[in-house]
Amino acid sequence: MEKKIIFLVFLVALLALPGFISTEVIKKDTPYKKRKFPYKSECLKACATSFTGGDESRIQEGKPGFFKCTCYFTTG
């Protein structure tokens, strides 16, 4: 019984591994002209509309800069 549980845990981990490897995080800048230093929430919305068609769940992080936002998002 214990060997079956260990085997199932190993199998699930093995099946989940390609999903972690296949996602690529991309870093791109997008201009933000409404504010000199935008809020983080404004950067997340700007990144989502610029690169993912409004899908905020694919945005990892949005870092504010001087009239820009640095966006980290996943493909797929």
Swiss-Prot record:
Belongs to the scoloptoxin-15 family. Expressed by the venom gland. This is Mu-scoloptoxin(15)-Ssm1a. Residues 33-36 are annotated as: Important for inhibition of KCNQ4. Coiled coil: none annotated. Blocks voltage-gated potassium channels Kv7.4/KCNQ4 (IC(50)=2.5 uM), Kv7.1/KCNQ1 (IC(50)=2.8 uM), Kv7.2/KCNQ2 (IC(50)=2.7 uM) and Kv7.5/KCNQ5 (IC(50)=2.7 uM). Targets the pore domain, in particular negatively charged residues 'Asp-266' and 'Asp-288', of KCNQ4 and probably other KCNQ channel family members where these residues are conserved. In vivo, shows vasoconstrictive activity resulting in acute hypertension when injected intravenously in mice. Also induces coronary vasospasms ultimately leading to heart failure. Induces seizures when injected into the hippocampus of mice. Changing residue 35 to K: No effect on inhibition of KCNQ4. Negative results: does not inhibit channels TRPV1 and TRPV2, voltage-gated potassium channels Kv2.1/KCNB1 and Kv4.1/KCND1, hERG, tetrodotoxin (TTX)-sensitive and TTX-insensitive sodium channels in DRG neurons or voltage-gated calcium channels in DRG neurons. Has the structural arrangement of an alpha-helix connected to a beta-sheet by disulfide bonds (CSalpha/beta). Since the toxin contains only 2 disulfide bonds, it is called 2ds-CSalpha/beta. Changing residue 36 to R: No effect on inhibition of KCNQ4.
